[in-house]
């Protein structure tokens, strides 16, 4: 809808933010962004479009580090999975990537940061421990959430911070993040710190129309559940690897 408003009001180019989670999506947020990319491939036949996929923006509202800030201010234990790895970018880096894609991206290109798996991919538990040491506290690993809560006041008084790290069993969490798939055509030579996915206008117009009709039918019905939305996603993205466990990382964090 925003693309059509831009086009109909004389815009020369359209830019849109995607996410690293759109590459081989395993959760609904990543899948919805991948679907957005698919719709924009069709719209790119009428006006140039570029996009950016980037990682978690450090300290942005709702991010892991924002949550750590809130827990630290409230003197609460830290809880995080020890087997999920994530990339992080600063607000400035994310803004620069968006500007580069908007100004320099060719039609249908998706820009992403060149981040090293060995240098920049880090587990949530490692981030928590580095954060606490930066704040002047030594992380103290507890065996359970209950122990972390019960010993919080005692440990914090001794400049130790209670932490509970666990193996992830939550819905829609990848073990690690990726910015592209092995099926996408990449340009890794144009910029030092940025790569580009070069897309062709390949799409199934009938499937896109069916998805739009399905969403509209749910809206007209006035009620829906998660499974109804998932069914629409699976019809358009048969490779969508969503696994529902009934548990969510936000609840554990």
Question: Where do the protein language model's features map onto the residues?
Answer:
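Conserved Rossmann-fold NAD(P)-dependent oxidoreductase catalytic core, especially the SDR/UDP-sugar
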Residues: 1-34, 42
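Strand-loop microenvironment adjacent to phosphate/nucleotide-handling motifs in alpha/beta enzyme folds
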Residues: 38-253
């Amino acid at each position: 809808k925003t693309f059509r408003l831009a086009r109909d009001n004389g815009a020369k180019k359209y830019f849109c933010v995607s996410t690293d989670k759109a590459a081989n999506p395993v959760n609904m947020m990543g899948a919805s962004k991948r679907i957005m990319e698919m719709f924009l491939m069709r719209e790119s036949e009428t006006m140039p479009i570029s996009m950016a996929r980037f990682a978690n923006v450090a300290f942005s509202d709702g991010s892991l580090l924002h949550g750590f800030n809130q827990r630290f201010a409230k003197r609460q234990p830290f809880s995080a999975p020890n087997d999920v790895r994530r990339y992080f970018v600063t607000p400035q880096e994310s803004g620069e990537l968006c500007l580069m894609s908007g100004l320099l991206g060719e039609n249908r290109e998706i820009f992403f940061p060149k981040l090293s798996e060995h240098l920049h991919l880090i587990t949530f538990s490692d981030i928590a421990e580095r954060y606490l040491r930066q704040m002047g506290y030594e992380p103290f690993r507890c065996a359970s959430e209950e122990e972390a809560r019960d010993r919080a006041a005692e440990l914090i008084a001794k400049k130790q911070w209670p932490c509970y790290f666990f193996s992830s069993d939550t819905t829609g969490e990848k073990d690690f993040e990726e910015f592209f798939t092995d099926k996408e055509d990449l340009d890794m030579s144009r910029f030092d710190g940025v790569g580009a996915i070069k897309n062709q206008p390949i799409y199934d117009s009938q499937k896109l129309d069916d998805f739009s009709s399905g969403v509209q039918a749910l809206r007209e019905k006035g009620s829906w559940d998660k499974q109804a939305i998932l069914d629409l996603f699976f019809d358009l993205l048969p490779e969508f690897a969503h696994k529902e466990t009934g548990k969510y990382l936000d609840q554990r964090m």
